[in-house]
């Protein structure tokens, strides 16, 4: 006992001295920590769902648990397991905690899984302890990953509780950024508000408890799950200096604590952070990442998550400035509409991502949401040398979530192109589009092929293709793709530019009667994902969308400013070309302007067709005509071109807005609060439903359709494949 107190006194004395100048013990600890921060190759994040959704058919033993996602990592290129003991929502954990809430309940919905946590606790252990011991026994590190504001509990409703919604949030709704009735525009209402000292203190205590009670090598503070930390930001603002400083002081406090614990146990605890890869974006969200690096509060920065904003060189340069290792974060792709021939989740794609990241100068790679611990690429991507002789795929875009989902105007920070089947680019005759593609440093040693997937284009000669200024010829059509050989000596390490131009429009399927490009006959409810590209870009409130008498009944029963039930379509139109929109509907109710309407934005101008019980109006042009819109269905035909807009009702011209289509679609004051980061749809989209927050409205819709003289085809995807001269077997 005497020896113990002497040790505690020595540590306390050294820490007191640290306030004036670091002691030799602390300097040694920091030097060891700095050295350790540069030793790993691959960090593998395990989200903890192996315990939360444990297969009922398996025995409740540590060994059976480890076989799910950990055992196969031994001997691979993975050097560190970062284990997340759920932390969803804030305060829920599957490790043994006295401060948080132990999550032992089963998650309803599957008879094939159950929560293993209670079984392991009865056996004197828990998921984090089991994984930590396994990692150390197999020569790997173990970090504990805390999701700093996970909102997988966002499906919670007061009348329908969600199992991941913690008691803390139910007991302290004042800790939350919003409420079920007052949802923010950016992020989830169930996020906790880090502007509050009480929330920051809880986060600190959760982290401190693990550092004191588990023999972990480091902690991962996952700020990407999820990027909502301040009420001011979630409701459309930017973080203030005071708010940022509050979170920064939390980081400082965590660093001090890890050094205290490190001195007590004689071994440092590393701090890693998972954050956006652009410091300015993170700054506005409330995370002063550059300050944390400058002050020495973090040891490793892992960049990107739902989106990558900049090429890796941007974050690498920041790391070098502050002497902090930088890791490229590889999240699993979630792109919809991919073709099975060339996919972002393939082994070849992970190789390409790694090759490119190493070429950019990263210090390591971080793997997120990969559930197969035996995945082949985990034994291939740990070094550039291991990757060099292997086939690869290079996509311009891997993840396509919107930065504006968490920060108003956040899309402006995106310089990495967003080109996916669900985010196509328009190809037109006479105008080339340039697609940047980032490629690793080994592509020149074998063969390279450019693969292009363009809607209805089956003739390779229909496209004029140049890569870094070199014309690509001799293309072939292969399984819905156009393949063009790319001379290896014309492939550059790093940024490459592919230019595509239509020589002529392809033969297209016969248009719908009337020449309509897109037609939604409202005899069914659109369902995700088959509905795409139609989207509902509003927070669910008191609204109804259902079939009634063969028509779509869409009703806004809420007076919340953000309650705007609608369907929107990202049409490809040009303001200088004629666009015709037609809708057939019967008004049921409208007690305010725009409670039932069509919104038409062509990239230059925006206008509403406002349907009221006794009139139809062009909102901005202030043109109106009397009409009983409730007794029967009417067909409204809107024609737009340049600055002209006209409306016909049941085939007869009713409103003439010649020269009055002039309200700018680019000015944010004319924008609606579209969610999920799609605020840019305000500039160019077709929208029907409600655009009035305070008002209530409902209508029966029979059809919505449009045709345009703008002629283009969709560039749906693009990828570069590289193959070495020889392909050796992968080694572990």
Give residue ranges: language-model regions.
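Beta-strand-rich ligand-recognition modules
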Residues: 454-512, 621-633, 657-680, 711
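Short tryptophan-centered beta-strand motifs in secreted/extracellular beta-sheet-rich domains
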Residues: 142, 581-583, 632-640, 645-649
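Secretory/extracellular carbohydrate-interaction modules
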Residues: 548-620, 708
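Catalytic domains of carbohydrate-active enzymes, especially glycoside hydrolases
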Residues: 64-91, 213-218, 297-303, 359-364
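Active-site neighborhood of glycoside hydrolase catalytic domains
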Residues: 198-323, 349
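Extracellular glycan-recognition surfaces and repeat-rich motifs
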Residues: 516-517, 521-557
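Active-site-adjacent "subsite" loops/lids of carbohydrate-active enzymes
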Residues: 35-59, 111-133, 143-209, 213, ...
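Ligand-recognition surfaces built from glycine- and aromatic
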Residues: 514-518, 661-732
